[in-house]
Amino acid sequence: MSAAPGLLHQELSCPLCLQLFDAPVTAECGHSFCRACLSRVAGEPAADGTVNCPCCQAPTRPQALSTNLQLARLVEGLAQVPQGHCEEHLDPLSIYCEQDRVLVCGVCASLGSHRGHRLLPAAEAHSRLKTQLPQQKLQLQEASMRKEKSVAVLEHQLTEVEETVRQFRGAVGEQLGKMRVFLAALEGSLDREAERVRSEAGVALRRELGGLHSYLEQLRQMEKVLEEVADKPQTEFLMKYCLVTSRLQKILAESPPPARLDIQLPIISDDFKFQVWRKMFRALMPALEELTFDPSSAHPSLVVSPTGRRVECSEQKAPPAGDDARQFDKAVAVVAQQLLSDGEHYWEVEVGDKPRWALGVMASEASRRGRLHAVPSQGLWLLGLRDGKTLEAHVEAKEPRALRTPERRPTRLGLYLSFGDGVLAFYDASDADALELLFAFRERLPGPVYPFFDVCWHDKGKNAQPLLLVGPDGQEA
């Protein structure tokens, strides 16, 4: 117990304020603090209702904190000792023990537990240790700066999480909202179709039913007549019989055919579900971009309409290209005036029965002069048609990748670009109600891009058909 007096003051001091405990409480982890100090440092409880211990960061429940009466009594007893005196010997604390880093009295230093330790007079220790304060203060400031940076990073991350969740919820709400609108419209359309079929079938069947009731009534009447004729005398019987049988044969000959009604309603099958999904997929696409061709970029052989939504290759000899770096001088191509740099975009191009073309995007920094090398590493992501038969994806290879031949040649192409997801997808948009995926590049684009259109040479009129940009109203130029 001889070691206790020198350290008792430290043991009964709050690790936060470094003063003797005032209303001490003990956390669930075992560390003790002044109640006021813990409340000030721990701050507001987390979502689970706990606060972190300032010493070990272990969670503790504020409601589990209660005054540590044993500590409080020890502090009360220690407070009776005159300040600056040994708790055990009541002598002045005049010597500093460097080994244990505590003030001790002469008895503790010469006879007690600090005998043989590195000892200094209190005055000398005061002067020496005071010179260390600036360095310790600097270390404290550096530690504070590091933690403040950590706090700033965490607060920024928290803000990013909140913003990401907000955007996610917004996107989910928007997409599901579109789905609900689409499905509600589809349900209404199918319900109206079912009601139309029910109404028309009801009218037709009631008409047939009325005819059958009338015919059955005639048969019943003839049955009564036959019963009446059977009881007639010979001469009258024979005269009536001929008339009755003649009438009966006529009625039987006029017998209406069995009622047949072909009810045409969609069958709720897997194919029906797939078709609904295809239609809904199109409905979820972003709104059509309002693109226009950039005349300043067009090859000299190309003619751009005044509306900027139609371009074709002229069969007349064109003048040579100028020195404008924005203009294509070899490729019979043109880009849109609109630069795309982020978000989602969707546009459609009417290609009709044009046998040769290429569509996609071009990096804003890619060169438009000379022969173009249509691969992603050169800033071009393209899908094209060759010889009116073969669809080709211009991937990173010596030759374009030939795709499977579609059942029908697309007459309208839909292009979907998502910078966030790193997707450039090409769809057959010929069907006004559905999209069919033809090919997709799945890589993040290095920067802004322009929608790109390779019209290709007119080939003596064989490839003279124009390319048409579809406007937001769904109509070509």
Swiss-Prot record:
InterPro entries: B30.2/SPRY, B30.2/SPRY_sf, Butyrophylin_SPRY, ConA-like_dom_sf, PRY, SPRY_dom, TRIM/RBCC, Znf_B-box
Activity regulation details: Specifically binds phosphatidylserine. The binding to phospholipids enhances ubiquitination activity.
Record: residues binding Zn(2+) 2: C29, H31, C53, C56
Pathway of action: Protein modification; protein ubiquitination
One GO term of the biological process aspect: exocytosis
Zinc finger (RING-type): 14-57
Entry EC number(s): 2.3.2.27
Zinc finger (B box-type): 81-122
Annotated positions binding Zn(2+) 1: C14, C17, C34, C37
Chief localisation class: membrane
Protein name in UniProt: Tripartite motif-containing protein 72
Gene it is expressed from: TRIM72
